[in-house]
């Protein structure tokens, strides 16, 4: 018995090549068309020429701060569940899938943070165009000497949401029919966190796209590593159910 999605050439095309090509084209289109500034201009204008939602309860406290704590708590819950599964025989089929989920989420967040540590880009609220003090400097542009470094690309908070794209593969091993719900959950969390941060002036849309691309890449790569163990877990689950039926 296999886990879903199945591997092979079709998987490489549908889960690796096409998604990453889509992310790359979207990021290039945003850069060439000025889509980041176009969207940020309108969000800024709708708030009266300021980032009025920067410190609002919903965007700052509820979604940004509480959302971060909720994500950490959920990840800790996955780790605790994995520890319990290691001690309880009836939970044995969940060991590999839970380990995958914990590792994939953590690696996604860490990879986003790592790229953010050297990318050196500013937040919209830092730019003179939106009431800040710094000029816009693109990702591949030479940053002027003396200009304070930026730390806003890719989007860390949105990455905390998109990290849960790995639910697609976790549920593919545990409840294959639910895997699309897992994918939808990861996309929904990433969009929720990302849009809230854009409304605050903390990120451009391309920052969120980059985070989604990183998290999906990590989820796929980690799945390839854990897939053999997840297949064994699926077979163990099927054997356990068969023994229970015979009993």
Identify the residue ranges that each predicted region occupies:
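Alpha-helical membrane-inserting segments
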Residues: 25, 29, 36, 75-83, ...
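Aromatic-anchored segments of alpha-helical transmembrane domains
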Residues: 25-28, 106-111, 187-198
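Transmembrane helix-loop junctions in multipass membrane proteins, especially transporters and channels
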Residues: 35, 86-90, 117-125, 202, ...
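Membrane-embedded catalytic cores of phosphoryl/pyrophosphoryl-handling enzymes
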Residues: 11-19, 137-247
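Alpha-helical transmembrane spans of integral membrane proteins, capturing the lipid-embedded, hydrophobic core
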Residues: 19-24, 73, 101-109, 212, ...
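Structural signal for the C-terminal ends of transmembrane alpha-helices
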Residues: 2-5, 79-90, 169-175, 221-227
